[in-house]
Structure formats: C-alpha cells, structure tokens
Amino acid sequence: SSFAGLPIYDDTNNCRSLAFGYSPERINPGDKEHKISSIIKVTSGNTENVSYWVDYLYSSIIKAGTHNAKNIKVAEAAKVIENTQRDLNIALINELSIVFKKMNIDTLDVINAAETKWNFLPFKPGLVGGHCIGVDPYYLVHKSEESGYIPNLLYSSRSINNSVADF
C-alpha cells in the first residue's frame, strides 16, 4: 500500500533489512521570512531506530527544531493536510469573492476589514499556486475513497479552485 505515492514497507513486505527515513518538504520558494532553517522539520522512519537517526540528523542542521512523527504515514498525512488546508482556504475566499462580486462588494476591502481580528487568516482570491497544493488534495481524496469515505468538501474545494479562471 502507499500514501501520497510512497510505498509503505513493513514487516509484512519482508523488507526487514531495508531502512529508510522520510521528511516532507516544507519550504516555500521565494519566501524570505520562512527559510529552511526557521521551519520545524517533520521527520520519520520505517523503524523506531531509523526514525531516531533521521530526527537526529535533521536536528543537527535545522535551527527551528524537529518533530519526530510517530511513523511515515503520519508524516506523509501531515504534509498532505498542510497543502489541503491551504487549498480549502483559497477555495473559501474564491467562492466568497464570487458572492461579493454579485453583491457589488469589494473582496479586498472585506479582507482588510476582517484582518483586524487577530485570528482571521487573510487569504486572497485567485489561482492556487505551487506545484503540490492543487495536487495533494487528490491524494487525500483517493485514500479517503479507498477507505470507504467520500470527501465532498475536498471535491468542492478542488472544483471551485479549478474553475476560478472562469471568473
């Protein structure tokens, strides 16, 4: 089996001698504030020992620290939901932008007003950027359906963001 494209090896695969670690990419190219040295690194391994050594290696070079995930599936799922959450938030603001336009309200004016509350997340309407933000939700959709659940919200957000160019 796999999650996010990475085969999962365990004792049932007769790969007891295979050791590998996993640490999802978390950088944002071009972002001058959030550099690799200031982003906590999620680490994992296919065994507890490998996980320890992967975490030890990254903790020696990442100043912000590390988070040693329980296993590779947890680390992979964390990466997928980071991007899926961003996709969902962009879909929300894109849909609100369509609604506000029909109501003759400037979306950016609304966002500027809403930003005055400390816990508002100021997403801007537009296309989803990055090479994985628009793709990772489909991995989660696939694994959800494989597990017997239809993730309607994920389908809706992808539909909204895929059609934003029409508006």
PLM region spans:
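Aromatic-acidic/polar surface patches that form glycan- and anion
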Residues: 85-89, 133, 161
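ATP-dependent carboxylate/acyl-activation modules
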Residues: 136-137, 141-167
